[in-house]
Design a protein with these regions (language model features):
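Glycine/threonine-rich flexible loop motifs
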Residues: 98-107
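Glycine-rich phosphate/pyrophosphate-binding loops
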Residues: 117-137
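Short beta-strand segments
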Residues: 6, 32-34, 92-95, 126-127, ...
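Electrostatically charged, flexible surface regions
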Residues: 137-241
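Alpha-helix C-terminal capping segments
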Residues: 79-84, 113-122
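Active-site metal-binding loops of divalent metal-dependent hydrolases
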Residues: 9
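A cross-family phosphate/adenosyl-ligand binding-site feature
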Residues: 3, 13-86
Length: 241
């Protein structure tokens, strides 16, 4: 099995090496990550200019590593179509910061697994809280065994996993709503600094990813690439006749 490991926190991520080493249990690992941090880049790709790709030193002789001076989605796109390698699975992360609710849509970490899905590849996005890398790494075996026990990859090929610090058990979740309110602070020369604050309130429904992860549960959320509202499509399909 050939595994692609990517992220949006760049080659400098402190958890990249341990994650790549952990992934070796599944097969041959290749690391293709952004040269610089790409948080908030979602599923964007570069179509107007060339970008740099370099093989870089990596502290494991079994793993080849490359940096791409572009987005996480471009890392996946280049790894598959530029390197011409037949990957079997994509792991994106471990992100520094949880990717929950609507904020998931802005995530470069999640954008990378959506790009993998565009090529029909199974993929998992992994995220944790700042300062939670060690705990997240320790939890990966538990998450792996949960996936195996319940045949999750046979039921769906795309997941978003959030591992909070001091985590409790694993919960299957669905996407929550907005839990950050944005603000923009005027700087000098018409420049604005984006900021925000949490507006999350615990509703007590722990099938929602925000509620689950922010109260300590490991959130495992099945994703879908197809954004068609099938209920509405099926209701309106007769208009085509």
């Amino acid at each position: 099995m050939r595994i692609l490991v990517t992220n949006d926190d760049s080659i400098t991520s402190e958890v990249l090496l341990p994650l790549a080493k952990w992934a070796k249990q599944f097969g041959e690992v290749t690391v293709v990550v952004p040269k610089y941090e790409q948080s908030g880049k979602s599923h964007c790709i570069e179509i107007h200019k060339a970008f740099e790709v370099k093989q870089v030193p990596f502290d494991d002789p079994d793993i080849k590593a490359y940096t791409v001076d572009s987005s996480p989605a471009d890392c996946v796109r280049y790894a598959i179509e530029g390197m011409k390698l037949d990957f079997d699975f994509v792991i994106s992360g471990i992100n520094r910061g949880l990717n929950l609710g609507i904020d998931m849509l802005y995530s470069g970490t999640v954008g990378a697994v959506f790009e993998a899905a565009c090529f029909g590849l199974p993929a998992v996005a992994l995220s944790t809280e700042p300062g939670g890398f060690d705990e997240a790494m320790d939890a990966l075996e538990e998450v792996k065994e949960f996936f195996i026990k319940h045949d999750l990859m046979k039921k769906n090929s795309l997941y978003n996993v959030n591992i909070p610090k001091n985590h409790k058990e694993i919960r299957i979740t669905r996407m929550g709503g907005r839990y950050f309110a944005d603000d923009f602070l005027l700087q000098d020369n018409d420049m604005y600094l984006p900021t925000g604050k949490s507006v999350w309130k615990d509703s007590g429904d722990y099938s929602i990813d925000t509620n689950a992860a922010l109260t300590g549960y490991i959130s495992v959320l099945p994703l879908t690439l197809n954004r068609t509202n099938m209920d509405v499509f099926q209701e309106l399909e007769n208009l085509n006749h």
